[in-house]
Amino acid sequence: VFPNLFLVNWKIDGEGKPVVRMINPTPSEIEDLIQLRLVGFNCRRYDNHIMYARLMGYTNEQLFNLSQKIINNSPNCFFGEAYNISFTDVYDFCSKKQSLKKWEIELSNKANDPYSKMDDEVRALCKKIKHHELGLPWDQPVPEELWTKVAEYCDDDVIATEATYKANLGDFVAREILAELANGSVNDTTNSLTTKFIFGKNRNPQSEFMYRDLSEPVTELPDDALAFLKEAKPEMMAEPFHGPK
C-alpha cells in the first residue's frame, strides 16, 4: 500500500498457476476476490482489513493512512467483519513465529541444500523464492512506470506464502484438529480455539475459577476437587492426610 498505489497479488494453489496482479482494484473486484478461500500470511492483522476497507470504498490515500495506523499499532483501526475474510492465516497456525522474509530465506536455503529433507513439490516451489528488497520508500507515491516492479516484488511474497503454507502442513493439520475439537474454524487464532476448547462458550470463565487464600493452610477440599484428585492421582491421595499442625 502506497499513497497512490494499492496492489493485491494472489494465485490459485498449485504448480504452474500464475500470480494474478490487481492494480488499484475496485470494490467490486475485491468483492469477487473474497468469495475465494483466501490463505494469507499475517492477514488477520493486516491484509483482511485493507481489503475490507477497499470493499467499503476507501480511496488509495485512505488505505495508506489505514495501513500506517495498523503498522504503528494505533487503536481502533481494525474492522470486526474483516477478520473472517480469510480461510486461514499461515503466520498464526505456524508453531514457529517469524516474518515472511525469514521464511523466504530459511526455505530457500533448505531447498537448495541437496541433503535436506523436503517434499519434492515443496522444494521446487521454494526454489522459486527470490528474496530481495524493493528499494522504494513506502511513504512516497510510486511513479507509474515502476508499478510493474512493485507488482513483481509482491509476486515473490505470494509464492513465499504458498511455500510456507506447504512446508508447515503439519501445523495446519494440528489447527484443523483443534478447530474441530473446539467447534471453531481454521481461521480462528490458536489462542481463541484453545480458550474455546477449555471453557466452551463461557466468555468469563474466571467466575468459575477456584481461588483460595495461599496464606492459609488447606484443611479440606470441595467434593468435586477431591473426586478429581482421587481419580487423577490415586497414589498421592492414598497417603494419609493429617492436616496442618
Question: What is the role of each PLM region?
Answer:
Residues 34-36:
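Short coil/turn segments at beta-strand junctions that form active-site/ligand-binding loops
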